Amino acid sequence: MAPIALLSVSNKHGIVPLAESLHRMHGFQLLSSGGTAKVLEDAGLPVTRVAEHTGAAEILGGRVKTLHPRVHGGILAMRGDPDHEVDLEQHQIPPIDVVVVNLYPFRETVANPQVSWETAIENIDIGGPAMVRAAAKNHAHVAVLTRPDQYDRFLVALSDGVDDQLRRELALEAFEHTAAYDVAISHWMGERLTEQASQWLEAIPLRQRLRYGENPHQHAAWYSAPQQGWGGAIQLQGKELSTNNLLDLEAALATVREFGYGTEGAQQAVQDAAVVVKHTNPCGVAIGTGVASALSRALDADRVSAFGGIVALNGLVDATTARELTSLFLECVVAPGFEPEAREILATKANLRLLELAPGAIDAAGRDHIRTILGGVLVQDQDDQSIDPTSWTVASKRSPNAEENADLTFAWRLVRHVRSNAIVVARAGQSLGVGAGQMNRVGSARLALEAAGDQARGAVLASDGFFPFDDTVRLAANHGICAVIQPGGSKRDADSIAVCDDFGLAMVLTGKRHFLH
């Protein structure tokens, strides 16, 4: 009797070459159903339909196709077991030797935020996981393939005989496949049925192993959902991404998205913006008339720190922008797109990592912010709620003028992306000084004001948290700051407001804190 391979896949990439090799080179009978069977038949391969094999027609609009003893008995039977052999003979069930199954695209379906409940439910696979689990359980006798990237390795092994080690590895990957699938379903349903945290975090597949972690002695790996967030990024050139690259890219992208992100239509950037990041903190941020102008201003904000930095741009990179990018050493650049001439210019920097990240991939990513602690993880919403200046209050006697209001809004967009304690000095849509990560707020203010230097006069200052004392505001006033924005809420707010009034500064309270740890 010819060996049997059962093929039923949602992702049909590589299925025809696999089936051709199984049938023509290794003598397998091909058993299939639905769309997979049609693809194989259209390729000229002889296929036995599952309905023909079982003698039972597909029912319930295709919901029941493979859930049948003649399928599962063939998968689960242990070769050489006398009782199993008797059952197979009595019920005329031929053994199935290879199971090639991947599941309905549930994760991809629910990546669309507008997906209906009914559509999502119809993309929950039932028969597929049952076959995968059955084959994985009986891996001593059945090889189970759940991903196209396994096909070539399996065919090479098949020529010499599939050993126990490969069968076990394939079984492990199969159980990982179904486990991740079930977690994705429960996570999605939980998010929509309750405001509370889901009982389980979503399973995220391995994308690639990284050279090392934050330091060379640390092992590291990158897990990412396909086509979601950074999983949808295309690396156009440059060296392999590192752990630190990815952390900095995430920080840069989050900051530049404050000003919109995209190249056209509804995804056109609101303001052309550029962000330069070092060690997850923005060291230069600016808006401009065109991406090239924004980049030049962002680099000018702190060219010393920009060396070896990560750049995020929120619009199409043209030749002028590309020339600016090649003017100094940078690690990575991310943008929604690159013009052909820009690609040619940037190609002269062979080690520069270029990433193209479409707005759609960002939209498809979840909003959970996840951090690890010893023995567990912490999950919170992203701090990405839209900023609404109409909800702010003026606490000082003097109100900010229109120019100051624009600067305060810009600085407030930026400060929530700086590590706490965070202080930002800015003017005319450009950061002038950033104070990050100090253990006291006035220390961060000193750093930001020193970096701004003489440019602090007439600029604004933003703080991610309230002022516990009036020392920060007094320091700002002595450096010529004209307006301050902060959450408010300190028992000593009145002291800081009084200093503003004494020096003629405007103070705006947002009522919202933006700590970043």
Curated annotation (Swiss-Prot):
Stored SUPFAM superfamilies: Cytidine deaminase-like (SSF53927), Methylglyoxal synthase-like (SSF52335)
Reactions the enzyme catalyzes: (6R)-10-formyltetrahydrofolate + 5-amino-1-(5-phospho-beta-D-ribosyl)imidazole-4-carboxamide = 5-formamido-1-(5-phospho-D-ribosyl)imidazole-4-carboxamide + (6S)-5,6,7,8-tetrahydrofolate; IMP + H2O = 5-formamido-1-(5-phospho-D-ribosyl)imidazole-4-carboxamide
Signal peptide stretch: none
InterPro entries in the cross-refs: AICAR_Tfase_dup_dom_sf, Cytidine_deaminase-like, MGS-like_dom, MGS-like_dom_sf, PurH-like
Please, which domain of life does this record's source organism belong to?
Bacteria
Determine if Nuclease is one of this entry's keywords. no
Q: Which UniProt keywords apply?
A: Hydrolase, Multifunctional enzyme, Purine biosynthesis, Transferase
Q: Quick one: a GO cellular component term?
A: cytosol
Tell me the ranges covered by the MGS-like domain, including all copies: 1-146
Q: Which CDD domains does UniProt cross-reference here? A: IMPCH
Q: Which GO terms describe its biological process?
A: 'de novo' IMP biosynthetic process
| Stated family | Belongs to the PurH family.
For this protein, the record's NCBIfam families field holds:
PRK00881.1 (NF002049), purH (TIGR00355)
Output the HAMAP family linked to this UniProt entry.
PurH
Quoted from the entry, the domain comment is: The IMP cyclohydrolase activity resides in the N-terminal region.
Give the protein name, as stated in the record: Bifunctional purine biosynthesis protein PurH
- Which species does the entry assign this protein to? Prochlorococcus marinus (strain MIT 9313)
